[in-house]
Regions:
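Glycine-rich, Arg-bearing micro-motifs that act as flexible, cationic patches
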Residues: 129-153
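Structural beta-alpha unit
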Residues: 1-18, 90-130, 137
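Short, structured coil segments at secondary-structure junctions
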Residues: 47, 95, 146, 153-155
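Short, well-ordered secondary-structure micro-motifs
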Residues: 36-37, 63-66, 111-114, 141-143
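General small-molecule cofactor/ligand-binding pocket signal
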Residues: 52-54, 100-104, 159
Length: 162
């Protein structure tokens, strides 16, 4: 699991057109995630790079679970991962883009940041950009959302799709 650190997000509109992009997109199959994946395909169109589709499995209190319960949760995550991978493949299928599907576990914002930082480290000279959809849930206005957490702590350019 990754820790969130404070930093200032960069402006994605200032990325030169000849830069290879590594677009990290959080994906859970929700309408905001689908919009974010569509936006990522638009951002990558006509450029070199890839879309890194990230499903973050979040278990709030692993310490309170028995070993048997953890095995069941892992099976559920495997099923969800396969379902989301299939949905992403259908959405990205014949667009001629390079994309990869990854599953991570932990805090969603922290894991998206860690994925972006790690992917850029693996591809020196490329630019990592996180693309996420914004949530319209009323509870997120009070408690915060993934997009808000990313906006506060993201060390790479960030695109929040309405």
């Amino acid at each position: 699991m990754s820790e969130i650190t404070n930093s200032q997000p960069q402006d994605a509109s200032t990325i030169p057109n000849d830069t290879n992009l590594r677009l990290v997109t959080g994906y859970d199959g929700s309408p905001p995630a689908i919009r974010a994946l569509d936006a990522a395909t638009s951002l990558l169109r006509g450029r070199h790079g890839s879309i890194e589709v990230i499903y973050v499995a979040h278990v709030p209190s692993v310490d309170m679970m028995s070993a048997d319960a953890l095995v069941e949760v892992e099976k559920d995550f495997d099923e969800i991962e396969e379902e989301l991978r299939t949905e992403a493949a259908a959405q990205l299928g014949n667009r001629g883009l390079t994309w990869h599907f990854h599953r991570r576990q932990g805090n969603i914002a922290a894991e998206l940041i860690a994925a972006a930082v790690g992917i850029v480290a693996d591809h020196p000279g490329d630019t990592g950009v996180i693309v996420v959809g914004s949530s319209s849930h009323a509870s997120h206005r009070v408690l915060g959302s993934v997009a808000v957490g990313l906006a506060r702590h993201c060390p790479v350019p960030l695109v929040i799709v309405p």
